[in-house]
Amino acid sequence: MEALVYTFLLIGTLGIIFFAIFFREPPRIVR
């Protein structure tokens, strides 16, 4: 069960960092 918790924390941290960088800079992807 600890592996699942560590994986969840890792994904959560990466997700927070990704959203922080994504919302800090204006999205340059034009569809």
UniProtKB/Swiss-Prot annotation:
Any single biological process term in GO: photosynthesis
Plastid recorded as keyword: yes
Pfam families cross-referenced by the UniProt entry: PsbT
The UniProt record lists the keyword Membrane: yes
Membrane topology: Single-pass membrane protein
InterPro entries reported for this sequence: PSII_PsbT, PSII_PsbT_sf
Membrane-spanning segments: 3-23
Keywords noted in UniProt: Chloroplast, Membrane, Photosynthesis, Photosystem II, Plastid, Thylakoid, Transmembrane, Transmembrane helix
Gene Ontology cellular component annotations, sorted alphabetically: chloroplast thylakoid membrane; photosystem II reaction center
Protein localization: Plastid, Chloroplast thylakoid membrane
Subunit structure: PSII is composed of 1 copy each of membrane proteins PsbA, PsbB, PsbC, PsbD, PsbE, PsbF, PsbH, PsbI, PsbJ, PsbK, PsbL, PsbM, PsbT, PsbY, PsbZ, Psb30/Ycf12, at least 3 peripheral proteins of the oxygen-evolving complex and a large number of cofactors. It forms dimeric complexes.
UniProt xrefs under PANTHER family: PHOTOSYSTEM II REACTION CENTER PROTEIN T, PTHR36411
Stated role: Found at the monomer-monomer interface of the photosystem II (PS II) dimer, plays a role in assembly and dimerization of PSII. PSII is a light-driven water plastoquinone oxidoreductase, using light energy to abstract electrons from H(2)O, generating a proton gradient subsequently used for ATP formation.
Protein family: Belongs to the PsbT family.
UniProt protein name: Photosystem II reaction center protein T
Organism expressing this protein natively: Stigeoclonium helveticum
The gene coding this protein: psbT
